[in-house]
Amino acid sequence: MSTAALLSFSLVALLTVLTPGLDTVMVLRTALLNGKRAAMGVVVGITLGCLVWAVASLAGLTALLQASELAYDVVRWLGAAYLIYLGAKALWNSRKSVSLDDSRPVPGAGASLRVGLLTNLLNPKVGVFYLSLLPQFMPAGEPAWGAVLVAVHLGLGLVWLPILIVVAGRARAFLLRQQALLDRLTASVFVALGLKLAFEAR
């Protein structure tokens, strides 16, 4: 692979990582309401989910999923239902008041990891992203470069998302006082993204 091709992919991957989306919302909300440790759990889950889709794409499994309309739709609808569930849960939480000294149980890193992982695994568009992007940059007959490109994309995410966590941590004291509003906003985003995933054309 040429240096120009690698840099081109890195730029595309960087723009993808920086573009606000579901991962950004998940990480910011978790960092603001549950703290840095839980937010890092979400980041690890997101990264593992992307890794699973990337490996599946390189192995040709994502192509099979995309070729089967029923299988694709089942995964898509499950993902949409999960996002709407997260939105409903956030809306329910908005009924409760929280303070910095609140002793309510906070989800651990493991529980947060599962949320990040499930959110990505139940979104077939992550797999389609890898399936459509990687072949454009991989040299013919050199599949090992696929692993390099995936590592670049995941590495950029592992740099950017923790930066968001640090920024959110600085605003946490203020925004915790606005938890009801924050929950309602993120609930609206989750439900909107769930409906978009459910009804969006392939």
Segments (PLM) and residue ranges:
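Juxtamembrane transmembrane-helix termini in multi-pass membrane transport proteins
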Residues: 2-73, 132-152, 161
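Hydrophobic alpha-helical transmembrane segments in multi-pass integral membrane proteins
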Residues: 56-58, 122-130, 190-202
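Flexible cytoplasmic inter-helical loops of multi-pass small-molecule transporters
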Residues: 92-108
